[in-house]
Amino acid sequence: KDGMLYVSLGQPHNVQPRDKIKLYNDVGIGGMVRMNAFDGSKREVYATGIRNSVGHDFNPKDGTLWFTDNQTDGMGDDIPAGEIIRITKAGQFFGYPWIQGKTRITEHGYDKDPLPTNVTNPEVYMDAHAADLGMAFYTGKKFPAKYQGGIFSAQHGSWNRTNPIGARIMFTSLKA
C-alpha cells in the first residue's frame, strides 16, 4: 500500500558479538529495512533488535507489519520462546541481543547488562525452537469464521530439542 518493500535481515550469528552491534544496527542486520519497491531508493532501517525473522505479513485490518522471529539456540529445550511481533511505528526496538521474549540472552554476557528501556515486547509467544517461518493473515472464505483475521504460521520444526517438535501449521487467533 505504501509503495515500500520490507526486507528482514537475519543475524549471521547465534548471538552477535558486541563489536558488531553498532554496524548491524546502522545497516539493519538483525532488523527490518524498507525501501522504495520500484527503484530501491529511500532505504532505511525500519526496526532493530530482531534475531532472525523469516516470515512477515501486513495485518489487513490495521496495516501494521507482523513477523516471526526465530530464537537463540543452545539455551535449553524450552527457552527462549518463539515470537510473533508487530511493528506499529518506524524505529521500534525488539530487544535482541539483550533479551528475546521473556528470556535474557546469556552468550557474550548480555544478561549482565541493564535491560534497554525501549524494548517492545512480542504480541504472541510460540513454542521454543519450533522455527516459525512463513506467516499469513487469513482473509479467505473457505474456513470457518473463527479463522478470519487470525495468523497461520508454518513451523519447520526443531533440530536442537530433547523431544523434537514440528513441522506443522499453527493458527493464532487475534480475537480477545
What are these regions (language model features)?
Residues 6-9:
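A conserved catalytic-loop motif detector
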Residues 1-3, 84:
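Short amphipathic alpha-helices and their capping/turn segments at secondary-structure boundaries
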Residues 3-4, 63:
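Loop/turn elements at helix/coil->beta-strand transitions in domains of secreted/extracellular proteins
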Residues 11-19, 26-44, 51-52, 57-176:
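Beta-propeller domain segments
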